[in-house]
Amino acid sequence: MIIFKNLLKLLIILLTIKLYFCIEIKREEHLTILNELNENSDVIQYSILPGNNEEYEIVKGIQEDAIVYGYYMSNVEVNGWAYLSLVSNDKYNDSTQSRAFGYLEGYLTKDLIWNSKVNYYKNAFNSSEIPNKLDDWLTENIESIHTFIVNNRKSRYWNQITLVMDQINGMLDGYNEANTNSSETLSLHDFFVLNMFGDLFDLMPALNLDKEYKYFQKDLNDIQDWFKRSQHCSALIKVSSDYSELYSGHTTWSGYYTMLRIFKSYNQQFSSDVSGTLSKRNIFSSYPGALISVDDFYLLGDTRMVVIETTNSLVTNDLYHLIRPTTVLSWMRVIVSNRMSTNGKEWCENFQRYNSGTYNNQWMIVSYNLFVPYNELKDGALYVLEQIPGYIEFSDQTQALRQGWWNSYNIPFYETIYDASGYNNYTANNYSDSTIYYMSYQTCPRAEIFRNFAGYVESLEDFQSLLRYNDFEYDPLSHKLPFYAIASRYDLSKKNPSPFGATDTKVTCNSMIDQNTIVAISGPTTSNGQPIFEWNSKIDFMESTSHLGCPEKYNFPWVSFSDTTFRNL
């Protein structure tokens, strides 16, 4: 009995020591994080606490009883990105967490949001206001969402949409609370528009606003001009030849005025039983005022999935009548799908619901749980979905990935989507050979460049290099045109140069997933000696393109981002 008591005491002592060291390790990790973030004096730490009369109290530092706490670095001159990491507290209900989440982000990022709004409205609408037709459509859409929510209170899907609305309304309130200038007050519709960057490329023509707003004009006789404004990105998913590593990466194409960037980490402790939230941790490249990536590129920490898209622009006007306000916009559906899915098939099934027919993309969902180094890829490792108004198609494309890689470059893969989107019309004799060549899934320039180089990728450095690739002067596959490249540079075109092209690259791989880490770089590519982009060196662009808050010069390093740190590499 005495021996037993002594053993019990010893066990208690050992457990106490273990607990002490666990607490100390956590404390040391936390202090390390704070020290790393505090190396830059621009880092802000705030907590949001419940106040009186349903208001919030925002305090400096990290508080244990905070609804949400976060780290924020606003200086984009450091490495081309602002940085925001927010964590909510599961002691509070989902709605309270979500609204406070949005509120703190809106409050902290107020200046970036205003600059981003000014740039987008001036460049897209040539105005400071939302077009009336679009404003009316948004009113109908938001009313429809509220009706669905009221009529589906027990639905986890609509509970998720409710949380999205809570978050965006919270962001609106936080922004306006931080704002001290009445002329810079924003509305809920403004925040919707900031999240609808991709949706608007289809919605504006559907509302017949493309003729009024040059930014959205689509001349089917000059399809490359339309692609220059609507095409969004190159992507590559690559398994190494010995199956030791699986890489996922994405290069955004966009107007250079969008290069006011922010990397975000959301840790939203919503319930799994009420809202169906299965992935609470999400790190992604983004823009001020957006709840989504827009690029899109997400690392979902809890489900070990990477979600990527590139845009498939419609080259027909025959489908726009299918776009209606009684659906759910793409930006909302991707949030819900990210939270409610544990694999690619589930993600696709969630995303296809309430198809808005806007932001018609090819989505790639990589399930790293189905990748084991040095073993054959399991079925379901890669799902690919494509959307057009009125129709969505998806399937398991793991077999294609087993051959080495999957590449994506703004041309539809599925034949039904390709034909319905109008691409098959450009094989007729009344179009030039170059146009037909550019519209082909198999022979367009990026398809050939990927085919030429992807097989040689065997390291993270190789992967990064390919996604920044532009050697248009010497690579015959580029035909001496700077936009026929993985990372385009339309500003270098001798004919009609414009401030458009590859604006970033983000990559991750299996060995980085468990650390919730993405490596990224901001700005136009300098691959193969391409010149560094500087606004001051482009006088025409300076005068015609609003780029408020953007760095003047883009010569930034690769940066490693996680949910707790960012470091220049």
From Swiss-Prot:
Keyword flag Hydrolase: yes
State if Signal is listed as a keyword: yes
InterPro entries the UniProt entry points to: PLipase_B-like
Gene3D superfamilies of this UniProt entry?
3.60.60.30
| Principal location | secreted
**What's a BP term from Gene Ontology annotated to this protein?**
phosphatidylinositol catabolic process
Where does the secretion signal sit in this chain?
Answer: 1-22
Q: Quick one: a GO cellular component term? A: extracellular region
- Recorded E.C. number(s)? 3.1.1.-
State the source organism's domain of life: Eukaryota
Query: Which Gene Ontology MF annotations are present?
Result: phospholipase activity
Instruction: Kindly state which keywords UniProt assigns to this record, in alphabetical order.
Output: Glycoprotein, Hydrolase, Lipid degradation, Lipid metabolism, Secreted, Signal
The entry's localization annotation reads:
Secreted
Positions annotated with a glycan in the UniProt record:
N93, N126, N181, N425, N430
Q: Which family does it belong to?
A: Belongs to the phospholipase B-like family.
Outline what the protein does: Probable phospholipase.
Q: What is this protein called?
A: Phospholipase B-like protein D
Lineage start:
Eukaryota, Amoebozoa, Evosea, Eumycetozoa, Dictyostelia
Gene name of the encoded protein: plbD
